[in-house]
Amino acid sequence: MENFILYEEIGRGSKSVVYKGRRKGTINFVAILCTDKCKRPEITNWVRLTHEIKHKNIVTFHEWYETSNHLWLVVELCTGGSLKTVIAQDENLPEDVVREFGIDLISGLHHLHKLGILFCDISPRKILLEGPGTLKFSNFCLAKVEGENLEEFFALVAAEEGGGDSGENVLKKSMKSRVKGSPVYTAPEVVRGAEFSISSDLWSVGCLLYEMFSGKPPFFSESISELTEKILCEDPLPPIPKDSSCPKASSDFTNLLDGLLQRDPQKRLTWTRLLQHSFWKKAFAGADQESSVEDLSLSRNTMECSGPQDSKELLQNSQSRQAKGHKSGQRLGHYFRLENPTEFRPKSTLEGQLNESMFLLSSRPTPRTSTAVEVSPGEDRTHCSPQKTSPLTKITSGRLSQQDLESQMRELIYTDSDLVVTPIIDNPKIMKQPPVKFDPKILHLPAYSVDKLLFLKDQDWNDFLQQVCSQIDSTEKSMGASRAKLNLLCYLCMVAGHQEVATRLLHSPLFKLLIQHLRIAPNWDIRAKVARVIGLLASHTTELQENTPVVEAIVLLTELIRENFRNSKLKQCLLPTLGELIYLVATQEEKKKNPRECWAFPLAAYTVLMRCLREGEERVVNHMAAKIIENVCTTFSAQAQGFITGEIGPILWYLFRHSTADSLRITAVSALCRITRHSPTAFQNVIEKVGLNSVINSLASAICKVQQYMLTLFTAMLSCGVHLQRLIQEKDFVSTIIRLLESPSTYIRAKAFLVLLYILIYNREMLLLSCQARLVMYIERDSRKITPGKEQQSGNEYLSKCLDLLIRHIVQELPRILGDILNSLANVSGRKHPSTVQVKQLKMCLPLMPIVLHLVTSQVFRPQVVTEEFLFSYGTILSHIKSVDSGETNIDGAIGLTASEEFIKITLSAFEAIIQYPILLKDYRSTVVDYILPPLVSLVQSQNVEWRLFSLRLLSETTSLLVNQEFGDGKEKASVDSDSNLLALIRDVLLPQYEHILVEPDPVPAYALKLLVAMTEHNPTFTRLVEESKLIPLIFEVTLEHQESILGNTMQSVIALLNNLVACKDSNMKLLYEQGLVSHICNLLTETATLCLDVDNKNNNEMAAALLFSLLDILHSMLTYTSGIVRLALQTQKSGSGEDIQAAEDLLLLNRPLTDLISLLIPLLPNEDPEIFDVSSKCLSILVQLYGGENPDSLSPENVEIFAHLLTSKEDPKEQKLLLRILRRMITSNEKHLESLKNAGSLLRALERLAPGSGSFADSVVAPLALEILQAVGR
């Protein structure tokens, strides 16, 4: 099963997501729709209708899958978005463009109708654009076969999925709402209840053409009933472009629309008239004219026939069926009919249940999108995001200007979590209040519950209010009367907690009476309880009428607090009520958006609250005052502006720093945060008074909620430039922010990313510090946590938005960093003594190179930053490094030798990281060959051993990658060009240096030889270059020097290279033999085989086996070559040519030492690896054919036992035959071997079992061979 890589999300619906994707192992991009399984009927319908359709104006279906949680639909990727998006962006399209788009629509729909398919729900969001502007029909969820009942089909699929047909009627009823499309484009007859038809689809096309030209559909209304009435009764207005400067509609276009938008389907244009219409300017002149309904039916019948038949017979069959009165919808072929839904199943039903992990999430970050994907009516809006058009635009696609970036950032400064409002009154975090209780026995009025009060009739409500007011207004002549009044007030506290009751009581005469008693009641207990009732009413009321005397209450409460300011208990009673009233006025004013003069209250209220904040007050009073400011400043109102003073920031900061209760500390900093939302100078005043270091220390040591508010404060201040230069230069501040990325709180991490983004926008150098502090690691961690396709909680969604902006900025910043580095190097290029300005520039820019390394080693950034532009810049930097290394340019004096070496090392390391991911270089092969490899080749000549080795390693590995990569369609020519450039580079520059490179200490020869291996394996012509460069003797010298470490990298490369050279048909074998190829192979094979046969030495066994196979491959090529020469000599012997015979004899003489390997090859035959047996047996066969039984140890007792074991254990007749032929050749060419066989009892028994008449099945070739050998030994 092949997996898919998912890239960015390009569309989303309530139950579906569309991703841009790629099949793993290919470069073919597709659109992948992931949908909930509840959408199975729609998706199944899409698949069964389109699975075999191939048309340029219809989105191609590829395949579909079912995993444990989702259905996955893989279709053609359209890169131009939807027609709806185009219309929305351009508002209206010129008539020429409408014609071009219309031709695509007509072509696609005509093809569908010829197949008997009705699209049914044609709308702009279901029409997608391919790159060059071709329109394609997509989303066939609601399409159907003509004459079919789609509700029944949906119910059938759903019932099948449910495991039976129980409740089928219920299913059909539930499907009615699912088969309805967009009413805006629905034909009048369908609105009346008729079935969809060819004619209704043509009406929808007319609506589309109208909307493309005018920018709006012919009929539109927010009200469904009004829209229906317009479609059924009104004629569309003439199409007029939104842009008045555009030309009016032509008479042809108007006539076409009139024909398509006829309410009577009988008068509507048919296919024949539509295709011949003059508006198309004969675009369909060569089209198939079988476009009437009858012709469409004939076309379907033709398609339904399963075998090759004469066209006349098909026509006769069609006519005979028509004569019998069959309707087109009754002649559905197997192509579309789905009476048994199991006929179409996603792949999981055939291949076992699949895991969601078959669709792998790319490391690439996922952009958030507001578009949706349609898989059912009213749910989705299809959208496909553009693909990259060229490598150079990979980064710039979706590039944000700094203005747009900061605009999006400002929207993220404050979240709902930062602006949560909690009650001021009865807030347990401020002060725990005793529970409110009342005694219904002494209430003297009905103790209605809240539910009862809500349903009182007006008269009963008025009576109830009158009773309440009467009791409150009664005089307190005795203690009993006071208790009764307090009891009533407690009852009011209970019912005031309900919003609707509180709203009615606040706007009743009771509220004025409560204010009066708050002023005149002689008993402070009653005053306190009255204040509490007022506060609860203000806290729970939902609206405020302008004639309600809230300002009077605020003034009164202010006076009472001011007159009794030293009475802390009284303040604790009155402050919450004052705060709730002020907050009520502020919220209502914010709703109404205009300040109300009737709600203006005196400055004394602000003064009193500010005094309550000051040092020396009880913490409860401080807390209440801070809470009031926190709530009021959440609103944008005149009341909030009253708290903005020069001292408010430091006062709240003092409360935060000197309070021990976390709840008060949180309230104080939250209030400061909300004031800063109105005026950033409030936090600026704090920093100026207490110092930035003190604020940073507080941020580092605070609890999570405080850290969230403080990060918001810093973000708000940075967004408006306050203390900007100081903050972006403060390394301790940046380090503290990065440490907060370890917080468990999603909001804190998101805000930390946002603060860092502000810093990086204005100080690029801080990106280096951030990377060194593991910023990239934190980004990768949080990118993995945010998985596309899942419903995200608000915290994760917020984190995703902040993270996306930071990633996009860093990706956009990298080219600028590289540009600065290039400029600084270009300015000093060729100079021995840079100027002071140039030195300063080098010191500022070159140390930023580690940023590149951090980004290319990140799975999030690497796919986005490695572009053609990046590789070109990187190659240019390498060219400057070559100049520095050669001494042509001197930067050591400017930045120091250590810094210079570090810069070169990091630059080379960055490319080393990139080549670990070959797919990144696939599209940029020519850029790498033309701009990166040349300076690397030059660095191979460096006097610095480290750079020489590093560059050779990079060169070797890069070349191996490039020559082994495959290219898709259209890339062959570029591949050939880059291959020729690569070959020329190595031939002209690198190979001449090999004479010195191969004699250097390890591991230099290993990398040099690895490059030769890759080139000779990929390009046979390179073999001649190796020979012409006189490298063969050097290669054998390397072999002699490294023979002791046969499993080392150098020897592995040597053997691989020799294998390529010997296997090449154009290779000069004479040269290889002259340099001692035979003796080297004998020695290497002997040593390697000994390692493989040593049962006690299991270390490096796999490596030795791989090496042995390569050596046997070389031996086989040598013997095959020799055998060919000998065969050629024997063929020419009759002609009397002595040269060929002499050459064959000389070659046989050269190869004679190889016969010593026979006694080594035989023990290798029982090897567990079948490939070892295969090549060993072939080598042994050719050796005995060429030299017979020359090796005296060929049939030693040990080897005889091996042959006996093999003939017994091997069941393949071909293998048995080969072994028997080897034995026969040995005994017929050497008497000694014949005598050895006579005494080999086990081998003779094995031969007897293979001979005819042994009682077992005998192969027609194997048995005679076994019999022949037995007869030779006299058995």
From Swiss-Prot:
Pfam families: HEAT_ULK4, Pkinase. Its EC number is 2.7.11.1. The active site is at residue 121. It catalyses: L-seryl-[protein] + ATP = O-phospho-L-seryl-[protein] + ADP + H(+); L-threonyl-[protein] + ATP = O-phospho-L-threonyl-[protein] + ADP + H(+). InterPro entries: ARM-like, ARM-type_fold, HEAT_ULK4_RUNKEL, Kinase-like_dom_sf, Prot_kinase_dom, ULK4. HEAT repeats lie at residues 727-765, 842-880, 926-964, 1025-1063, 1151-1189, 1213-1253. Residues 299-346, 359-393 are annotated as: Disordered. This is Serine/threonine-protein kinase ULK4. It comes from Pongo abelii (Sumatran orangutan). Transmembrane segments: none annotated. Belongs to the protein kinase superfamily. Ser/Thr protein kinase family. APG1/unc-51/ULK1 subfamily. SUPFAM superfamilies: ARM repeat, Protein kinase-like (PK-like). CDD domains: STKc_ULK4. May be involved in the remodeling of cytoskeletal components, such as alpha-tubulin, and in this way regulates neurite branching and elongation, as well as cell motility. Gene3D superfamilies: Leucine-rich Repeat Variant (1.25.10.10), Transferase(Phosphotransferase) domain 1 (1.10.510.10). Residues 336-346 have a biased composition (Basic and acidic residues). GO terms for molecular function: ATP binding; protein serine kinase activity; protein serine/threonine kinase activity. Residues 4-280 form the Protein kinase domain.
